[in-house]
Amino acid sequence: MAVKRARGKIVRRLGINIFGNPKYTRLLGKKPAPPGKEHGVKQRAKVSVYGEQLKEKQKFRFAYGMSERQFRNLFAQAHRMKGVTGNNMLSLMERRLDNTVFRMGFAISRVQARQMVSHRYFLINGKTANIPSMRISAHDVITTKNRKGIHSIIRHNLTLSQGQRGSWLNVDEEQLSATVSELPRAQDIHPVGNIQHIVEYYSR
């Protein structure tokens, strides 16, 4: 996995629950200050423009579980595409299979979704898919393997849904499957930060 640092410290440093797991929201409620600044800190220190851009980049990179190299390559690809670079980045990140599983409500976090994909829980158009970073396409059909243990986990996760489901997905909770009705658009996505800051960061 690209992100190996302590997730609790990352969440506290960035000041937002980027991983989706409710336990990190509770952690921020108890310890809102960044690590190492727990005592006597009333508010977060002001940062430079560069520092703010870097912080926003880290929000997205950690949220989607990407290495710096993967993230830079994604920016380069988005920049080559037609349209607005920031919007293209959002769409490409949302199209990752691990994120799609998360948006389906089948996992409570992208971290869990990544593990489920790696353990071969899912099929795309009838073929086993085990690469978290692979991108889904319009009209793809994502199904789960017919195993009782897998279905039990997913049905439990569906009861814990945090309202993160993607509007571009048609989810069948009975069959535990989903169809990609269209590619995700920027207006359909609730980003974890300011995507324009990332464009500015890499355009320096």
Swiss-Prot record:
<dbReference type="InterPro" id="IPR002942">
    <property type="entry name" value="S4_RNA-bd"/>
</dbReference>
<keyword id="KW-0694">RNA-binding</keyword>
<dbReference type="GO" id="GO:0042274">
    <property type="term" value="P:ribosomal small subunit biogenesis"/>
</dbReference>
<dbReference type="GO" id="GO:0019843">
    <property type="term" value="F:rRNA binding"/>
</dbReference>
<comment type="subunit">
    <text>Part of the 30S ribosomal subunit. Contacts protein S5. The interaction surface between S4 and S5 is involved in control of translational fidelity.</text>
</comment>
<keyword id="KW-0699">rRNA-binding</keyword>
<dbReference type="GO" id="GO:0015935">
    <property type="term" value="C:small ribosomal subunit"/>
</dbReference>
<dbReference type="InterPro" id="IPR036986">
    <property type="entry name" value="S4_RNA-bd_sf"/>
</dbReference>
<dbReference type="InterPro" id="IPR005709">
    <property type="entry name" value="Ribosomal_uS4_bac-type"/>
</dbReference>
<keyword id="KW-0687">Ribonucleoprotein</keyword>
<protein>
    <recommendedName>
        <fullName>Small ribosomal subunit protein uS4</fullName>
    </recommendedName>
</protein>
<comment type="function">
    <text>One of the primary rRNA binding proteins, it binds directly to 16S rRNA where it nucleates assembly of the body of the 30S subunit.</text>
</comment>
<dbReference type="Pfam" id="PF01479">
    <property type="entry name" value="S4"/>
</dbReference>
<keyword id="KW-0689">Ribosomal protein</keyword>
<comment type="function">
    <text>With S5 and S12 plays an important role in translational accuracy.</text>
</comment>
<dbReference type="InterPro" id="IPR018079">
    <property type="entry name" value="Ribosomal_uS4_CS"/>
</dbReference>
<dbReference type="Pfam" id="PF00163">
    <property type="entry name" value="Ribosomal_S4"/>
</dbReference>
<dbReference type="InterPro" id="IPR022801">
    <property type="entry name" value="Ribosomal_uS4"/>
</dbReference>
<comment type="similarity">
    <text>Belongs to the universal ribosomal protein uS4 family.</text>
</comment>
<dbReference type="GO" id="GO:0003735">
    <property type="term" value="F:structural constituent of ribosome"/>
</dbReference>
<feature type="domain" description="S4 RNA-binding">
    <location>
        <begin position="95"/>
        <end position="157"/>
    </location>
</feature>
<dbReference type="GO" id="GO:0006412">
    <property type="term" value="P:translation"/>
</dbReference>
<dbReference type="InterPro" id="IPR001912">
    <property type="entry name" value="Ribosomal_uS4_N"/>
</dbReference>
